[in-house]
Amino acid sequence: MKKRALVSVSDKTGVVEFVKGLLEQGIEVISTGGTKKLLEENGLQVIGISEVTGFPEIMDGRVKTLHPNIHGGLLAVRDNETHVAQMNELGIEPIDFVIVNLYPFKETIAKPDVTFADAIENIDIGGPTMIRSAAKNHKFVSVIVDPVDYDVVLAELEENGEVKEETKRKLAAKVFRHTAAYDALISNYLTEQMGEESPETLTVTFEKKQDLRYGENPHQKATFYKAPFAATSSVAYAEQLHGKELSYNNINDADAALSIVKEFTEPAVVAVKHMNPCGVGVGTDIHEAYTRAYEADPVSIFGGIIAANREIDKSTAEKLHEIFLEIIIAPSFSKEALEVLQNKKNLRLLTVNIEKSTSASKKLTSVQGGLLVQEEDTLSLDESTISIPTKREPSEQEWKDLKLAWKVVKHVKSNAIVLAKDDMTIGVGAGQMNRVGSAKIAITQAGEKAQGSALASDAFFPMPDTLEEAAKAGITAIIQPGGSIRDEDSIKVADTYGIAMVFTGVRHFKH
């Protein structure tokens, strides 16, 4: 019996050439709507779906393949005598190939002016039903949903006259991944439209961006996936201009650096190691900002990741070229800067839109046996809600330093302490199990620069010991959430040493 293929695609990439190959193999082709029209315009002889179903396409194409003559031909088990007898009795012919991809729901809801009605109209019904039927019966039916697989199928047909069983299984698995992702997009869109923040089930879909050499360590396998509607201001959507392939750790560090540099509107440069900032500087231009970020910690920056929120110019590139760096991320690089930096074969250069999100996206954290979901911490300092409990208020310069330190501290692993002075960080204490321990690290790193600096803490002081350490180092201003039952003890110490202290009322733990 002559083999038959059913072709109905939204993405028409390569479909004419593929169908031509099927016809050359003696395979009969059934098609629908726009696909049929395209194939016929290219001189290919195909059979209309209505000739198979004996029923016209109705309801603006909503009902065309939902018919026993189609699904019987897809689902019949060819070595089951009962199935074969029923097919013969009802005049149903088998369908051996299904080439279908679905209505462009993702592309539709990505449009800024999309209406709810437009979105609903682009929910495919017949397509998923067909490919699921074919995939279930993949022992007898080859189903292709991705144009990238056209060449594989044609090559096997030309070589063997049929598609290998292993290939059919792989194609079937791809179908169910495809429909699962498609349904997840629809589910998430409708959930969002209804304003449901914590649905009883959560289905997420990500698209593979690249395989990675390994994970956090060489013995761990890893892959990088991107969210279908992630902000373009993200590592997932960055363009790599030069250098080696990104590693797992590179991606994590680049993400951390990008998150911090987005906090600043003035020219800023951030240096990151192991997802913590080691130096942050701001200035009148990007060269000055980099100089300050470098001077913040010239030891730790070695082998680090740099993020800038302005174009990298030649003079800045020449300074960057002097040290070993893994990655430089910026909105753009001047032609001259690229010429300088591309001399380093392995240095990764990424361009990305630097734009702080105004709405909190969801952050997913995997735990053993489950998943934690929370909003990203995008909250900025609100000066209208702060309080100053100390006798002395911060000076203009202290305010400037406090704001810089506060922007940075929320991106440092808790317990977090950041010292800032003269438009740069001068000490970072990260990830200690007690707050005073982080303060001591930051103060030690700052050395003599701590005199007259500002300190930011991501959470309140449970005891005044951190204040005591700050006072001994000559720190003159502190910003912290407040809210401890011992706040009065900290306020008394601050007043004793003439330290100005600001309470924000907002905690910024990061784990």
Curated annotation (Swiss-Prot):
Pathway: Purine metabolism; IMP biosynthesis via de novo pathway; 5-formamido-1-(5-phospho-D-ribosyl)imidazole-4-carboxamide from 5-amino-1-(5-phospho-D-ribosyl)imidazole-4-carboxamide (10-formyl THF route): step 1/1; Purine metabolism; IMP biosynthesis via de novo pathway; IMP from 5-formamido-1-(5-phospho-D-ribosyl)imidazole-4-carboxamide: step 1/1. GO terms for molecular function: IMP cyclohydrolase activity; phosphoribosylaminoimidazolecarboxamide formyltransferase activity. This is Bifunctional purine biosynthesis protein PurH. The IMP cyclohydrolase activity resides in the N-terminal region. It catalyses: (6R)-10-formyltetrahydrofolate + 5-amino-1-(5-phospho-beta-D-ribosyl)imidazole-4-carboxamide = 5-formamido-1-(5-phospho-D-ribosyl)imidazole-4-carboxamide + (6S)-5,6,7,8-tetrahydrofolate; IMP + H2O = 5-formamido-1-(5-phospho-D-ribosyl)imidazole-4-carboxamide. Belongs to the PurH family. GO terms for cellular component: cytosol. It comes from Bacillus cereus (strain ATCC 10987 / NRS 248). Residues 1-145 form the MGS-like domain. SUPFAM superfamilies: Cytidine deaminase-like (SSF53927), Methylglyoxal synthase-like (SSF52335). Keywords: Hydrolase, Multifunctional enzyme, Purine biosynthesis, Transferase. One of its GO terms (biological process) is 'de novo' IMP biosynthetic process. The keyword S-adenosyl-L-methionine does not apply. InterPro entries: AICAR_Tfase_dup_dom_sf (IPR024051), Cytidine_deaminase-like (IPR016193), MGS-like_dom (IPR011607), MGS-like_dom_sf (IPR036914), PurH-like (IPR002695). It comes from the Bacteria. Its EC number is 2.1.2.3, 3.5.4.10.
